[in-house]
Amino acid sequence: MVICNMEDASRYEGLHPLFPTLFAYMRSHDLLHEPTGRITIDGDRLFINNSAPECLAADKQIIEVHRRYIDVHFLLEGSETIGWKPTGECTALSQPYDAEKECALYAEPAQTYVTLHPGQIAIV
């Protein structure tokens, strides 16, 4: 997991070949005022799920695991607490991996929590 401000995101562009394109898009677009939904940048290789999720308290969250995509959270307003736990330590499977939804769900507490504020990014 990487946590940073948008101003520092360029330090992490070398972690994935599509990060420079993603971060450039995020810097140059007002995502808060874009319609919610999928924003396609490079087909299925790179896209943004622009959403306004209901943020749950840490004790009500479940663990979401991805296999194909990297999840990059970019907070636009308010605050959001997200949890993390090593995938190999997740045991309470509540939804098996679904390739179409690209996730599996585990109903158990995370090991670590971080609260994001506007302009902050979490790469999980």
Language-model segments: residues:
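Structural motif
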Residues: L46-F47, H73, I121
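Conserved metal-binding segment of the jelly-roll/cupin
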Residues: V114-V124
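A short, N-terminal "cap"/entry segment at the start of jelly-roll beta-barrel domains
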Residues: V2-N50, A57-V65
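Residue-level signal for pocket-adjacent positions within structured domains
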Residues: M1, A58, A92, E100
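Conserved short histidine dyad/triad with adjacent acidic residue
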Residues: I48-H66, L76-T91
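Short, conserved beta-strand element in jelly-roll/cupin
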Residues: R68-E80, P86-G88, P96-Y106, L116
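Short, mixed-charge amphipathic alpha-helical segments
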Residues: P109-Y113
